[in-house]
Amino acid sequence: EWCKTKNIAGKLSAEKSLPEEVFQWSKRSVALLLNRMFAGDGWISIMKKNAAKRIELGIASPNLEFMHQVKSLLNTSGISSNIYEVKNMKLQKNRFFKLRVTHSKSVARFIHQIGIYGKVRQEHLDIIRNGKHNVKAGAIVKKIETTRVLKCYDISVEKNENFFVDGLLTHNTGISVI
């Protein structure tokens, strides 16, 4: 019913965006919205690479702004995600984007705080519970060394030192206090 009042229901994915009020909702309401979005348009899958298994959650849309809105909502719940442009899709003429949650802690947080109605299976929960999700991911730093010195510039704009980048509060490297 809410989707109808906000003129979201019945729109194509490329035309959808979230009303500003969503970003003021309680965590519980945001979790319910994300749950239903991922239940309808999202996926959860087990990716197998060698002996390791990892879980991937995702949602896709040709609307990059919408993907960034979803990413911001996930960030507020402590769930990290990445947006990728999908290229060379035979059926898709325009640009297409996938938002993916793959980091084990973010996947676990998503499943426990938000869930995907009707899509989470016991096998997904077992992989997370056993701590074997995404075991071989990442890189191991063996050595840090200086290769060359580069110039770095800091540009400050008075009274605008703090700002949001991809939904996270950040600041320039000046002397501002967050």
Model region roles, listed by residue range:
Residues E1-I178:
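Internal intein/HINT superfamily modules and their associated LAGLIDADG
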